[in-house]
């Protein structure tokens, strides 16, 4: 379940923040939180509308928002990969691996 994965990863990241004086993770955490909210609202919109395609064709702004989210996801993926390369801490490695997995899933989900 991606919702619980999001929660779990966000919790782990906030723990990492407390535990280390390393670079601030705030930006990444904020981005992940907004992505989670967006994804949740996307799911609700689709359920309410029933037909995603009519929603798309009616709503240019919605498409812009979507491509903006893809940009954010790509940025987060890069950021997470970068952190993965630079950490020796196994707790952090696991967290970032999970985050990466989740981001790729969400990207795939939004794409379909």
Swiss-Prot record:
Name the predominant localization: virion
> Where is this protein localized, as stated in its record?
Virion; Host nucleus
The record's section on Pfam families has: Flu_NS2 (PF00601)
Motif stretch (Nuclear export signal): 9-18, 82-91
Q: Which GO terms describe its biological process?
A: exit of virus from host cell nucleus through nuclear pore
One CC-aspect GO term: virion component
Q: Which InterPro entries match?
A: Flu_NS2 (IPR000968)
Q: Which keywords annotate this record?
A: Host nucleus, Host-virus interaction, Transport, Virion
The source's superkingdom equals Viruses
Assembly description: Binds M1 protein. May interact with human nucleoporin RAB/HRB and exportin XPO1/CRM1.
Its job: Mediates the nuclear export of encapsidated genomic RNAs (ribonucleoproteins, RNPs). Acts as an adapter between viral RNPs complexes and the nuclear export machinery of the cell. Possesses no intrinsic RNA-binding activity, but includes a C-terminal M1-binding domain. This domain is believed to allow recognition of RNPs to which the M1 protein is bound.
Family to which this protein belongs: Belongs to the influenza viruses NEP family.
Return the protein name: Nuclear export protein
Q: Organism source for this protein? A: Influenza A virus (strain A/Equine/London/1416/1973 H7N7)
Gene name, per UniProt, is: NS
